[in-house]
UniProtKB/Swiss-Prot annotation:
The gene is Mpp2. Signal peptide: none annotated. This is MAGUK p55 subfamily member 2. The modification Phosphoserine is found at S42, S121. Expressed in pyramidal neurons of CA1 region of the hippocampus. Residues 8-59, 60-118 form the L27 domain. Gene3D superfamilies: 2.30.42.10, L27 domain, P-loop containing nucleotide triphosphate hydrolases, SH3 Domains. Residues 140-219 form the PDZ domain. GO terms for biological process: excitatory postsynaptic potential; long-term synaptic potentiation; protein homooligomerization.
Length: 552
């Protein structure tokens, strides 16, 4: 084996030490290098490298595979010497011993590879499930449990028999490894089980102490699933789900929770567990939940119309719309949000910080405070406008000035993240401006409309999205009064303005909450700013969960 490969630890460390020079040499993206470092530093990968090193070691080969013939030649040569030397006689006696002869015979068989592997056990034909079972095919499995304890297994009826449908990851049965999917349950504590899955579940749940199961093994080979992690975008309570095959085996979760999917064999029900730990449970699959949420009423509703004959129908046609980016908020309201596949990344700095919130909630104040606090680390874009510059204004200081025709052409070409018109003039944020701030090595801080997050949420911008939530009405009014008294603000908000801010904040949270990485209630600007600082520092020291599309 080559010397350079004898020490996998030093070889991997050498790769890690040289990752910093890869961007210049290969043009690799920063996010790809972060992902590569996370893989290289993973204990699993290091263990695999050690295993590979062991497997690649020089294999021992037999010198010869006819040692029995060689021993016979030696014995013939020793025949004459044995009469003259006691040592030769002892050697001849050892070489002729049955145990030594068997050892040499076994060695020669292995060296010449003349051995045969026995054929695998054939699977059982389900068509014979109702025929008498040979006594040697039945197994007895013993389980100790307490009353009310769930075994972590569900059943189905197949050919009149109760068959194990699924084994929940992390449950009692999965940990013991004595039962497998497809096993047929014949008896429980000597009593036939019948053909009712719910009755069997209740019998097993109420049993305590030693439970003896008579089973007919399935001989199915289990397969190892790939690791899948998802972020949930809805709340789920199995106790309230009428479709659940086993409410006790369900897993409860809330929107924003991170789950590991451990089994997806069933098209409608997956097995999952919380990434923080705990036993696995059943959750509705992506397909099942999409069907449930997409269920709509029939086109014709049986509602009587005045002035018509009895029994006539009032028809309601479905509204058809062509997708327009200018009206994407309408489509966002009808987007089905179930699960989002995510991946765990080592600590890294996000390229953009996106502040989302209602108008007047304090986004711009937080952005300005963050840039003033660390201008070498944070920056922002200069907005573009089609209005003419004032005498005191300079290009790039406050605004970048372009003609209306040029700006309209760039808007049609999709070069603006967002844009609007005020008093006959266009204003907007160019996407290239964001790229420029990121290229300078700074985090680009943006306070944009919620619709813009869909454009930014890519591997190019890897945004950290923070929702600045409005406090309750009374707190918001007190904050505005304090800002007026301290001279921080000169605009007094009316009662309608305050209520509008609170209502808009709630609408944004309902419609775009699945995009938020963090939510901060801005009831005190200084406290909210400190919480934002802390969150940004954690990104540099703690692992992060990001959409899997950013990684692969």
């Amino acid at each position: 084996m080559p010397v350079a490969a004898t020490n996998s630890e030093s070889a991997m460390q050498q790769v890690l030490d040289n990752l910093g020079s890869l961007p210049n040499a290969t043009g690799a993206a920063e996010l790809d290098l972060i992902f590569l470092r996370g893989i290289m530093e993973s204990p699993i990968v290091r263990s695999l490298a050690k295993a590979h090193e062991r497997l690649e070691e020089t294999k021992l080969e037999a010198v010869r595979d006819n040692n029995l013939e060689l021993v016979q030649e030696i014995l013939r040569d020793l025949a004459e010497l044995a009469e003259q030397s006691s040592t030769a006689a002892e050697l001849a006696r050892i070489l002729q011993e049955p145990h030594f002869q068997s050892l040499l015979e076994t060695h020669d068989s292995v060296a010449s590879k003349t051995y045969e592997t026995p054929p695998p056990s054939p699977g059982l034909d389900p068509t014979f499930s109702n025929q008498p079972v040979p006594p040697d095919a039945v197994r007895m499995v013993g389980i100790r449990k307490t009353a009310g304890e769930h075994l972590g297994v569900t059943f189905r009826v197949e050919g009149g028999e109760l068959v194990i449908a699924r084994i929940l990851h992390g449950g009692m049965v999965a940990q013991q490894g004595l039962l497998h999917v497809g096993d047929i349950i014949k008896e429980v504590n000597g009593q036939p089980v019948g053909s009712d899955p719910r009755a069997l579940q209740e019998l097993l749940r109420s049993a305590s102490g030693s439970v003896i199961l008579k089973i007919l093994p399935s001989y199915q080979e289990p397969h190892l699933p790939r690791q899948v992690f998802v972020k949930c975008h809805f709340d789920y309570d199995p106790a309230r789900d009428s479709l659940s095959p086993c409410k006790e085996a369900g897993l409860r979760f809330n929107a924003g929770d991170l789950l590991q999917i451990v089994n997806q064999d069933d098209a409608n029900w997956w097995q999952a567990c919380h990434v923080e730990g705990g036993s696995a449970g059943l959750i509705p699959s992506q397909l099942l939940e999409e069907k449930r949420k997409a269920f709509v009423k029939r086109d014709l509703e049986l509602t009587p119309t005045s002035g018509t004959l009895c029994g006539s129908l009032s028809g309601k046609k479905k509204k058809r719309m062509m997708y327009l980016t200018t009206k994407n908020a309408e489509f966002d309201r009808h987007e089905l949000l179930i699960y989002e596949e995510v991946a765990r990344m080592p600590p890294f700095r996000r390229k953009t910080l996106v502040l989302i919130g209602a108008q007047g909630v304090g986004r711009r104040s937080l952005k300005n405070k963050l840039i003033l606090w660390d201008p070498d680390r944070y920056g922002t874009t200069v907005p573009y406008t089609s209005r003419r510059p004032k005498d005191s204004e300079r290009e790039g200081q406050g605004y970048s000035f372009v003609s209306r025709g040029e700006m309209e052409a760039d808007i049609r070409a999709g070069r603006y993240l967002e844009h609007g018109e005020y008093e006959g003039n266009l204003y907007g944020t160019r996407i290239d401006s964001i790229r420029g701030v990121v290229a300078s090595g700074k985090v680009c801080v943006l306070d944009v409309n919620p619709q813009a997050v869909k454009v930014l949420r890519t591997a190019e911008f890897v945004p950290y999205v923070v929702f600045i939530e409005a406090p309750d009405y009374e707190t918001l009014r007190a904050m505005n009064r304090a800002a007026l008294e301290s001279g921080v603000s000169t605009k007094q908000l009316t009662e309608a303005d305050l209520r509008r801010t609170v209502e808009e904040s709630s609408r944004i949270q309902r419609g775009y909450g699945h995009y938020f990485d963090l939510s901060l209630v801005n009831s005190n600007l200084e406290r909210t700013f400190r919480e934002l600082q802390t969150a940004m520092e954690k990104l540099r020291t703690e692992p992060q969960w990001v959409p899997v599309s950013w990684v692969y």
